[in-house]
């Protein structure tokens, strides 16, 4: 499967706007997908998104600027839907049992070869995108993500890579 690639740069709100503008219809399709599987009313989803907006803002206000930029670029009337996308795992974990059928990451030493599978819905495969983010002259990020989501599986130009896995815990956590 070949994924489309887009490149964005600038300040967080500018990157978000470019992301939203380039992937507007894909973002709408991603919102529709999650709205169906969240198993909650739109009002409940948006209330949860408000909570996660404050958590995200407390952690890093620039992330909120990027999320708001995505909503503006994609012409999403309610930016809370973009917060819901960026909090999808947390919202899903409230009702959908998650466990052994989630993604797997692996690393081989000493070369530090890193890989991950993406065990999620086949309905999202055609929406996935390779996003290249030029953060600064010295920093570029390449990641596989879902439209409207500011961070997922990828690597930066300094050689730091990130995988995304769901970890099951015996108590809820709020924050990072």
Regions found by a protein language model. Name each.
Residues 1-176:
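N-terminal mature-domain region immediately after signal-peptide cleavage
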């Amino acid at each position: 499967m070949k994924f489309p690639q887009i490149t964005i740069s600038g300040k967080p709100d500018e990157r978000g706007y470019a992301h939203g503008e380039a992937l507007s219809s894909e973002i709408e399709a991603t919102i529709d997908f999650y709205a169906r599987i969240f198993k909650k009313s739109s009002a409940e989803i948006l209330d949860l998104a408000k909570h996660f907006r404050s958590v995200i803002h407390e952690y890093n206000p620039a992330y909120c600027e990027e999320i708001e930029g995505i909503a503006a670029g994609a012409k999403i009337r309610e930016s809370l839907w973009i917060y819901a996308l960026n909090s999808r795992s947390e919202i899903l974990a409230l009702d959908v049992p998650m466990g052994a059928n989630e993604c797997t990451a692996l690393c081989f030493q000493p070369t530090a070869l890193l890989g991950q599978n993406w065990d999620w819905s086949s309905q999202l495969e055609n929406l996935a995108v390779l996003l290249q983010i030029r953060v600064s002259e010295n920093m570029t990020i390449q990641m596989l993500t879902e439209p409207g989501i500011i961070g997922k599986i990828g690597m930066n130009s300094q050689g730091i890579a990130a995988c995304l896995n769901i970890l099951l815990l015996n108590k809820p956590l709020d924050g990072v």
